[in-house]
Amino acid sequence: MLSQIYPQAQHPYSFELNKDMHISAAHFIPRESAGACSRVHGHTYTVNITVAGDELDDSGFLVNFSVLKKLVHGNYDHTLLNDHEDFSQDDRYSLPTTEVVAKTIYDNVQAYLDTLENKPTCVQVFVRETPTSYCVYRPKKGGLNG
C-alpha cells in the first residue's frame, strides 16, 4: 500500500498508531437528491484509523493492528453496505454516505477499544471514497476517553 498523508488529529496522548486498509464495497443512497449515487455502485475505499493512548497492553501494543483490520475489513469488504444493520435505517445518520461510513467505523472501533484495560481511544477515522473525495470523522472532545 502506498504511504498516505492524512490530516492529523491533535490529542494529548503519548502513543498514536494508524492502520490503513482498503475496502471494496458497493452502496447506494436511497434519495432522489443523491443523483447518480442513488443507483448501486462501488468503490475501493481507503480507510485510515488513528488510535491513541498512554498505556500499552501486556503485549506492548496500544491495540493489535490485526484486530482493527478484522473489525473493519472483515465486516465490510466485498459487501453491499446497505445490507448491513449499521446502514439499514432510513434516516440521514444511517445512510451509507462517506460521512456515515466514517462515523460508523469510529463507533465500532471505539466500542471494541472500550473493552480494553489500557483504554486507548480512536481519535480519527479517514475514509477516501475516490481519489479526489474523502471524509474525516473525529469525535467531539467530550467524547474522548481520558
Curated annotation (Swiss-Prot):
Q: Which residue positions are annotated as catalytic?
A: 37, 78, 129
Per the record, the domain of life is Bacteria
Q: What is its EC number?
A: 4.1.2.50
Query: Which one GO biological process term can you cite for this protein?
Result: queuosine biosynthetic process
- Assembly behavior: Homotetramer.
Main role?
Catalyzes the conversion of 7,8-dihydroneopterin triphosphate (H2NTP) to 6-carboxy-5,6,7,8-tetrahydropterin (CPH4) and acetaldehyde.
Its recorded name reads: 6-carboxy-5,6,7,8-tetrahydropterin synthase
Give the encoding gene's name: queD
